[in-house]
Design a protein with these regions (language model features):
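Structural/interface elements that position substrates and couple domains in central-metabolism enzymes
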Residues: 1-341
Length: 341
């Protein structure tokens, strides 16, 4: 393991780049980390060296070629020394069977022989199927489609969580009934969508659609719905507390998804802020996966969910296994009135 490009790249035949692709304050794609990594790799290649560069970061179609080509123009390296390929990162932290060694991969490059070689490489890493596609751009687009579709699917069930209770219907019962149909895609509603992929990648899709004169409808709508869930959920907690802001509330879970310690883009933070804006008093947060969370000053991170008297409501924000396995009879003793959201 090294952070020294200069000592490692010259001896390599292949470089895999997997860095974050965030958005800026205006929700526009920020390729800074990708460009910086590519420049560092290209800049470390010997004058007579050759290298295949595989990008794994989520990007728009055309980005791999564009960023590498631009880097080569400003370097001592000729175009003939570098081959380009793309294989999007796929992993689902916290879920068994979806690790790097399990999931299928998609490989596209500028050369059929290189595509075959890289496919064989990834097939040694994963037990999943490795799909070779016709171009870098097809592979890039596939990753955007995966995550944009998931955001849309989750937005629909979140919308159902808003609608169905108004009809006097239980959301879980309706979804479970619908799931008896063989081609129904089952998702669960929540207080929002978090992580470094699903809330971010759709903006890359929206941007490239708009840049090509396509009026994207579903992805922007999905982003609006999913981004609204922390506010909606906070208002539902107030409603559950007889229309009064809770004086004391216990939130279980802070990370963006169950069984991980990653709190990037967690919807729990805007949910907490919405509670505070709605006049909530003391807020306690318990998450067995996170030692220190970047919480507002008025929020207390606790190491034990039990023994806190006078709690108005318990919120299951992130359903860790440890949360599900809590002694709910004991936890109930902390509540003034049995209220669990």
């Amino acid at each position: 393991v090294t952070t020294d490009y200069g000592s490692s790249i010259p001896s390599c035949d292949l470089a895999i780049i997997c860095v974050p692709t965030p958005v800026d304050a205006e929700l526009q794609p920020d390729l800074g980390p990708v460009k910086s990594a590519i420049d560092s790799v290209v800049g470390s290649l010997k004058i007579d060296g050759n290298l295949a560069i595989i990008l794994e970061s989520t990007v728009q179609p055309g980005t791999t070629r564009k960023c590498i080509s631009e880097s080569l123009v400003n370097s001592h390296v000729s175009r003939e020394q570098v081959l380009m390929a793309y294989c999007p990162e796929r992993v689902s932290p916290g879920e068994g069977g979806y690790g790097v060694q399990d999931v299928g991969r998609v490989v596209g490059s500028e050369d059929p022989i290189l595509t075959e070689v890289i496919s064989q490489l990834y097939q040694q890493i994963t037990s999943g199927n490795v799909r070779a596609v016709s171009s870098i751009e097809v592979a890039e687009a596939s990753k955007l489609v995966e995550n944009a579709q998931r955001d849309i699917d989750i937005a629909f069930v979140n919308e159902l969580a808003v609608l169905l209770p108004k009809l006097g219907l239980d959301v879980e019962e309706v979804l479970s009934a619908a799931a008896t149909k063989w081609n129904f895609h089952r998702h669960k509603p929540g207080i929002g969508v978090g992580g470094h992929c699903i809330p971010i990648d759709p903006h890359y899709y929206i941007d490239i659609a708009q840049s090509n004169g396509v009026d994207s409808v579903m992805s922007p709508a999905a982003r609006v719905r999913n981004s609204s869930m922390p506010s909606f959920s906070a208002k539902e907690v107030v409603r559950l507390c007889d229309g009064k802001a809770p004086e004391k509330i216990l939130i279980l879970g802070y990370s963006y998804k169950p069984n991980v310690s990653d709190s990037r883009e967690t919807p729990v933070l805007p949910f907490i802020n919405e509670l505070l804006d709605n006049g909530a008093g003391e807020i306690l947060v318990w998450d067995p996966f996170i030692d220190t969370a970047n919480l507002p000053n008025s929020v207390n991170q606790i190491s034990n969910p039990y023994g806190h008297e006078g709690v108005d409501c318990v919120v299951i924000a992130t359903a860790h296994d440890e949360v599900k396995d809590l002694d709910w009879s004991n936890l109930k003793k902390t509540l003034k009135v049995p209220r669990i959201f």
